[in-house]
């Protein structure tokens, strides 16, 4: 079913209007992520992350690509999507939560998915100094924020 421009705008704003979904979109600005990477950052169960991603896909903001056991999510590559994100998130690059998310995403990109997806959201179980350091930096950013 094709949406009218008004219906599409409403659907998009509803999708963006949830803080977790907005965080996910801002994370995806830096490149594609697996669902388990997103879940590790937002600290939500895979089923909840999947629901949020489904809403973002329905709104036409995110696409997925299956790669074996993993599903990679990325922003839809169009100027309209980037324009919307810029319009609704001015100053977000200075937000403590967004900064903490970015620190964690950067560290998690270096962890093999098999390893990351096996720790059930408990990043402290990853025996990796870079993750421990990133968790510490993220906590400091949030405390200062």
Predicted regions and their residues:
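N-terminal helix-turn-helix DNA-binding core of bacterial DNA-binding proteins
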Residues: 4-48, 70-80
């Amino acid at each position: 079913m094709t949406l009218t421009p008004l219906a599409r705008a409403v659907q998009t704003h509803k999708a963006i209007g949830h803080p977790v979904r907005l965080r996910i979109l801002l994370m995806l600005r830096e490149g594609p992520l697996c669902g388990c990477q997103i879940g590790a950052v937002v600290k939500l169960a895979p089923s909840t992350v999947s629901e949020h991603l489904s809403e973002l896909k329905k709104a036409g903001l995110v696409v997925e690509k299956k790669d074996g056991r993993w599903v990679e999510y990325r922003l839809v590559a169009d100027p309209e999507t980037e324009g919307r994100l810029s319009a609704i998130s001015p100053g977000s690059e200075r937000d403590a939560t967004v900064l903490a998310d970015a620190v964690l995403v950067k560290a998690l990109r270096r962890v093999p998915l098999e390893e990351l997806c096996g720790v059930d959201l408990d990043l402290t179980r990853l025996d990796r100094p870079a993750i421990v350091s990133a968790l510490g930096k993220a906590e400091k950013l949030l405390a200062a924020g």
